[in-house]
Amino acid sequence: MSHISVLLHETVDALLANRDTGIYIDGTFGRGGHTRLLLSKLGSDAQVYGFDKDPQALAVAHQLEQEDLRFKIIHASFADIQTELEQRGITQVEGVMADLGVSSPQLDQAERGFSFMQDGPLDMRMDNSQGKTAAEWLLSIEEEALANIIYQYGEERYSRRIARAIKQAGALETTAQLAELVKTAHPKWEKHKHPATRTFQAIRIAINKELEDIEIFLPQAVTLLKPEGRLAVITFHSLEDRLIKQFIQKESTLPEDSGWGLPQKQVDSRRLKKISRIRASEEEVKANPRSRSAWLRVAERLV
């Protein structure tokens, strides 16, 4: 299945807010769907910078660099957004977006080791040039720590049973081995959901430090935004969405009033204004079932 960008027009339109110039950041370039639409709506003096760790995404991005001189790709995590941009002399931008989903090619290519639907090496690294593979990581982690991760990042109620089965099995080499092991250890299957879904999600999040990277990325993104600049983030599961929601809430809420009225300094401390929360339309879900769980949250920089 080729990659279809989720909430494509909604995200780009929210990010631009009727502008056609400025500097914009795509924190998760992927296969470039959002970036290409963004470039098509921007004038000749605009700039777009993409970030990605995935070697296959980088290959697509380098091709786009040749096609459009307004675009530059940066081989780094969006957690390094501020440092990487400052090194290039950029301290303020008009918009920052991130699509936190795993791309369809990553899921569909068995050799990437993300999918329980296809057999492949147990890898799961976004950047497969560095770090431990899922197989190596599972071998090295203690059972209790693994159970906690499966519970926390997969919201899996049978995490202890699954962790015990994984550790008792010893070295695992393929996604099919892990999926079968989880299936056997899982006593109660959810309707329309593979029993290994939550466990695979948890392991992927842990290996790639996905939630930690989001927590590092968000305050940096807001710091980079000019007043009236936009932040647009697409999430695919409740853990991600909760992080984005809580961050925007914190940055857009006034401190508690002591009863004497808030000093102007505290009123001015709010950095964001909530703009919208959008989910994929019925038409989009029908055309691309992977968009079913997607949410787009948009906020605007105040000061």
Swiss-Prot record:
Its main location: cytoplasm. It is found in: Cytoplasm. It comes from the Bacteria. Coiled coil: none annotated. Its EC number is 2.1.1.199. Pfam families: Methyltransf_5. The keyword GTP-binding does not apply. Belongs to the methyltransferase superfamily. RsmH family. Specifically methylates the N4 position of cytidine in position 1402 (C1402) of 16S rRNA. This is Ribosomal RNA small subunit methyltransferase H.
